[in-house]
Swiss-Prot record:
It comes from Mus musculus (Mouse). Residues 1-38 are extracellular. PANTHER family: FXYD DOMAIN-CONTAINING ION TRANSPORT REGULATOR 3, SODIUM/POTASSIUM-TRANSPORTING ATPASE SUBUNIT GAMMA. This is FXYD domain-containing ion transport regulator 3. The lineage of its organism: Eukaryota, Metazoa, Chordata, Craniata, Vertebrata. The keyword Repeat does not apply.
Amino acid sequence: MQEVVLSLLVLLAGLPTLDANDPENKNDPFYYDWYSLRVGGLICAGILCALGIIVLMSGKCKCKFRQKPSHRPGEGPPLITPGSAHNC
């Protein structure tokens, strides 16, 4: 019984593919020109990559590597000096 139901479901799931339109039908509202889309995406990616390299090389963007390193906890002035604890 389960095999019959499973085969019926597979048949019903596959029926819409038999009625599918020709992918080269240019009048179809769901026809996509994949070549133009791919070329446009590559051009856009190339422009964004070039702009990113220009911004990094221009020097206007201050990177964290050029800043002075922060003080370490051991290098700061001592909070408790000798003899200051008895003044509380």
